[in-house]
Every structure is written in structure tokens, then in C-alpha cells.
Amino acid sequence: DYGWLLENLVFNCINNKQEVFYYSEKTECDFLIVKNKEIKQAIQVCHELNEKNREREIEGLGEAMKKFKLREGLLLTNSQEEELKLDGKKIVIKPVWKWLLRLEK
């Protein structure tokens, strides 16, 4: 399952540097990044956004962003890239390889 592999890759990269939690209420968000005891970022990971999962993946990220008052969320995929607005908040959809390159800076 490529989605599971991508999630594990992302988890291993962020878990070494930051405190990480999982969010689950009505929906789920894969990773919440904590800095100074405050949630600073929400990250959702899926291999590919498609008709079957797009709403679920974006809704999970959006719910976490709303609950923790985050203005921006990150959705990492294998190759897709776009930006969209959800309830006035920005969701950045980015290939995981581009995100990995930014971690090195």
C-alpha cells in the first residue's frame, strides 16, 4: 500500500525532529506537529487524491485546522500539486519529494 509507505516516510522524517500526534474525532488527520506545547501544523498524507478519497482527506485536514485554529494545512501526495481554500483557510497539496527537499534547508 503506497499510501501507508508515504505516511511512514513522513512520520519518520518529522518524528526525529518534532513532537507528533494523530488527530481523530469526526474525521482524521495523520499528523499534528507540536512546538512549544502548541499545535503549529496539520499534515495529511495520501498516495493520490481521487474521486473516492478527495473529500475525506481534505475534510480530515480541514477539521484539524479548524479545531486548532491553523490558517494553513499541508496535504502530501505522491505527485499532485495545487492550492485550494477551505472556509477561508489555505490547503497546500504538494508532492512528498518537494516537502522532503525543504526539510534539508
Task: Label each residue range with its predicted role.
Residues 1-105:
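A cross-kingdom feature that marks ATP-driven nucleic-acid transaction machinery
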